[in-house]
Amino acid sequence: MLYPIKFNPLLKSLVWGGEKIAPYKGIKTEQHHVGESWEISGVPGNESVVAEGSLAGKTVVELLEEYKEQIVGRHVYANTGNQFPLLIKFIDAASDLSIQVHPDDALAGVRHNGSKGKTEMWYVIEADKDAYLLSGLSKTITPEEYEKMVADNTITDVIARHNVKKGDVFFLPAGRIHAICGGCFIAEIQQTSDITYRIYDYGRMGLDGKPRELHTELAKDAIDFKAYSDYRTDYVTRENENTPLVECQYFTTSLLDLTQPLTQGLADRDSFTIVICTEGEGTVTVEGDNIDPQHKTVSLRQGETVLVPACATSMTVTPSGNIKVLTSYIK
C-alpha cells in the first residue's frame, strides 16, 4: 500500500551556490556552495530515493515500475511511463547564475535523444534587499542581433530585469532567456529535464578552475526572441483557501497559506500531487482505498517536500500555527 512519500534530497554544490539550503531544510551536510536541493527527481543518474516507511530505499523509477498509475495517475503514466514528469528544487543563489535558455519538447526530442524540454516556474521564498531576477527580453530582437550582442558581451542590455521580494512568482516557458541572480532563494518546479543552453557566464571559472562551456549557437534555435509584458505572475493570496498561481500543460501549481486545516478532494484529479513546504510546519493526511491507514499522515516542515500518490482521494493539510505550501499536479 502507498502513503505520502518523502525522498532524500540530492544536494548539488555549484560555483554560484550559497550556504542557506541546509539550515533552511534543518539538515547537516559537509558540502559547501550548495546551490540546489533536488527534492523529487526522475532525471537519469539523479533519481530520488524514498527516505522513510516501507518503501524506503526504492528510487522513484522503481516506484513507477511497481505501482504505475497508482503513483502518478492514468493519463500521466500513459504520457510519461516510468519517468517521473516533474523535477522539484530549492535553489540558493549566492551569486548570479549564468544567463541561459532551455529547449522545448520538439527541439529537445530531436537534439537530445527523445528528451523532454524544460518549462519551469519560480516561487521566491526569500530575497535579499535589492535582489533581482532576469526573465525574458526587454525588447524584441533578431537572431542576428542576438549573436552580435553575445559576441560583444552586451546581451544583458536587452534582458528584462525584475526586482523581487518574498512570494513573487515567475512562469518561464521553454525558450525564455532567464537567470536567477545573487540573493534569491527559490522553489523551482519544472519538467524533468537537465538540458540547459548557457548563453553568458560573466567570464567566470567553474569549480574545476576552468571556464564553463557556452552554448551560443545551440541556444539560438531555442530562444523566443519576442518581448512580452507579463513576465511576473500576479496573484492575490486567499488565506485558508487554494490560491492558483500557474497552470500550463506540464503542471498546475497553487499556494496554500493556512492557519487552519484545509481538505482538498483529489478523486477527479487523476494525478499525483506534490506538496512543497516553504514556511512553517504541520501535517499532510491522505485518504484512499490503496492508502496505508497506519501511515496516512506525515509531518511536514519548512524545506520538506511530499509526494501524494494519485490513488489518494483526498488530502488534508493541517498547520501547526501557520504553514505555507505549494501544491503541484498535472491536469
Residue ranges and their predicted role:
Residues 81-83, 91-96, 127-130, 176-196, ...:
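Ligand-binding loop in jelly-roll beta-barrel domains
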Residues 152-158, 169-171, 177-228:
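An exposed, glycine/acidic-rich loop-and-rim segment of catalytic or binding clefts
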Residues 1-141, 201-232, 253:
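Transition-metal
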Residues 115, 126-166, 171:
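Intrinsically disordered, low-complexity linker/loop segments enriched in Gly/Pro
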Residues 263-264, 280-285:
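Short beta-strand segments in beta-sandwich/barrel cores
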Residues 88, 97, 114, 120-123, ...:
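His/acidic/aromatic-lined binding-pocket segments of jelly-roll/cupin-type domains
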Residues 214-267:
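Functionally critical, mid-to-C-terminal surface segments that flank or help form catalytic/ligand
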Residues 158-171, 185, 287-312:
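Short acidic-glycine-tyrosine-enriched beta hairpin
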